[in-house]
Amino acid sequence: MKRYDYPIVKTLLDTDAYKLHMQQAVFYHYKNVNVVAEFLCRGDNFLGCYANILLDQISMMRSLSLSHEEYVYMTSFPFFKKEYLHWLKKFRYNVSQVKINSYQGRLHIRISGLWKEVILWEVPILALISEVFHGNFSPEITSQSALQYLDIKLKKFFNRTKYIDLSHLKIVDFGTRRRFSYDVQYSIVKRLKESFPFLIGSSNYHIARILKIKPVGTQAHEWFQAHQQIGSNLKNSQILALQKWLYQYKNHLGIALTDSITMDAFLDDFNLHFASFYQGIRHDSGDPVKWGEKALKHYEKLGIDPCTKTLLFSDNLDFKKIISLYKKFHKKINVIFGIGTKLTCDIPYVKPLNIVIKLVECNGKPVAKISDSPGKTFCLDRIFLKNLCQVFNVSLKNR
């Protein structure tokens, strides 16, 4: 088995943008909230054999901190507040929050502690698992291998779009969590910046800083999940989450995620007030065409011109799906496409891991993610899941 005597994650900013955006909101609104998150491998991979390597890597992360150059970079964004950035500069990973073990070949990870601290563990841990697994399973693969296949895909893309107006096409790298490796992600995004005019940014703050492109991201499911136990009324949990985000960011970072419960449940709460203030919404599960059509109808019903809003698609995209969705929607509404695993771990003979880390508790009580794809439901408490479905009028079937 390949051993690592060096840290794979080398900077605090090697993470997804929405983690830092959510962390700031938690820092100001929920400093004393405690959460628990757990790892799930949705595939049939036995990853327990890597537990000790991961423990070593996580131990190395205790020394990570924001450098002066990174701090100065972060101050360039108007939505980051001085108090938060000053705190972030002093932040250190608390390794004791992460418990890792192997049971019957399966990898088990449980992370618990203050939400403002726990929130930064998910992305680097998933990236570590993916890189360690692929480094051992496919050691012959290099960044050059990934670039060669990317060039083939780009050639097909340009052939397919020869007669399509791509002047409104915008694509973002969303590939940190399940990347083959950091080197592969960096090389891929660098190549796209150099030869693909439709790349507008990356969800990875470190890569965005190094390559001088825009960091992109707003909030994740955990923002909505935690609010299921923060407020006093479960039915109003999405409304509270949406409102708190507006309090924090006002005219910035205005893309809302729709599938923490379901799109229908989200739209019930996404009233004229929210639909007007938020720049747009993000798709992460379910049929993207049906979802997009629902979004258009909702904006029209509220009297909002869809051309002033944005749909961000981010569920299991590849270049072929992007072309199809772009053709379907770009004349009706602004569209952005976040492409992840099919960008940073799309290499012949390499099977990406289907892994997640999700919140399971907030303040000692269960939380859930339901989504528009039954296979993506995540909750450890069946009674709470049933109650959540009843409150939001969602079917429990296949969940």
Curated annotation (Swiss-Prot):
The modification Phosphohistidine is found at H221. Transiently phosphorylated on a His residue during the reaction cycle. Phosphorylation strongly increases the affinity for substrates and increases the rate of nicotinate D-ribonucleotide production. Dephosphorylation regenerates the low-affinity form of the enzyme, leading to product release. GO terms for molecular function: nicotinate phosphoribosyltransferase activity. CDD domains: PncB_like. Pathway: Cofactor biosynthesis; NAD(+) biosynthesis; nicotinate D-ribonucleotide from nicotinate: step 1/1. Keywords: Ligase, Phosphoprotein, Pyridine nucleotide biosynthesis. It catalyses: nicotinate + 5-phospho-alpha-D-ribose 1-diphosphate + ATP + H2O = nicotinate beta-D-ribonucleotide + ADP + phosphate + diphosphate. Coiled coil: none annotated. It comes from the Bacteria. SUPFAM superfamilies: Nicotinate/Quinolinate PRTase C-terminal domain-like, Nicotinate/Quinolinate PRTase N-terminal domain-like. GO terms for cellular component: cytosol. Catalyzes the synthesis of beta-nicotinate D-ribonucleotide from nicotinate and 5-phospho-D-ribose 1-phosphate at the expense of ATP. This is Nicotinate phosphoribosyltransferase. The gene is pncB.
